[in-house]
Amino acid sequence: MVGEGEAVNRLSGVLLVDDNPLQLRVREAVLRKAGFHVCVATTADSALAMLHALADRVGVVVTDHIMPERSGSELVRAIRAENNWLPIVVLSGLPEAFGEYEGLDVVFRAKPFPPAELIELVRSSLDQAARQRGAA
């Protein structure tokens, strides 16, 4: 796991947020094996702190929907209050939770899904962000 302050490539890092340690480790391993630089957080508050510390290195946030203290939708709203361009992928076992993210410009994916789909979601989100930055 990459902790706070450890370097990842500029705007190509993945901030992975999940309170479930097993899910976090599995997704981190999948993304690392695919060549991504990954930093992890287990709460929305720690994710926000890491995002501030690594703002110039994180290119996409992948978060779970259900977490203690602050939900994925609360995390997304906090990120969107400061950053409209950062791609965010929300993962949830509750497809009906999609409504909580309307208007927040996220990719919502119902769980479960194959590891290859996570890789493609991250890759396409990073590619889209790079195109948007290039057009700006």
Model regions: which residues?
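Receiver (REC) domain active-site loop signature in two-component systems and cognate sites
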Residues: 67
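Two-component/phosphorelay signaling modules centered on CheY-like receiver
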Residues: 21-39, 106
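Acidic catalytic/metal-coordinating carboxylates
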Residues: 42-46, 71-75
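A Lys-centered signature of the CheY-like receiver
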Residues: 111
